[in-house]
Amino acid sequence: MVEQTDKGVISWHPNPQTPAYVPPAGAVDAHCHVFGPAKQFPFAPERKYTPGDAGKDMLFALRDHLGFARNVIVQATCHGRDNRALVDALRASAGRARGVASIAPDITDAELQELHDAGVRGIRFNFVKRLVDATPK
């Protein structure tokens, strides 16, 4: 459950219910995000929304609570092309997560290798303009 606060920050449900359905062994949460913590991993100035902090520890606790074995962590648009929160989560996952990064067209081979070494296996293309572009086209 997500709730919009009066300050424009999206707040997360503090106590999600355990689902009645049990995922099969080895099940993967195939699309999830880490958000911040903003003091360590600031949100992009051009972001279209501001989430409450929901870092790697919260994500991994939710994964375990829901009964998933692994995650595919997708770079959140609120972090723009700064993949540090994603990479931090991947490195802390003990091999239980892979990532999808957002990159600039001029990314270097060395930067791509660093993302790969952290566990990134895909690139996110943002075609939904409402997530990344203030002006509808």
Name what the model sees in each region.
Residues V2-R81:
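An N-terminally biased module of ancient metal coordination in phosphate/nucleic-acid-related enzymes
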Residues V2-S11, G80-K137:
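Active-site gating/metal-coordination segments in enzymes
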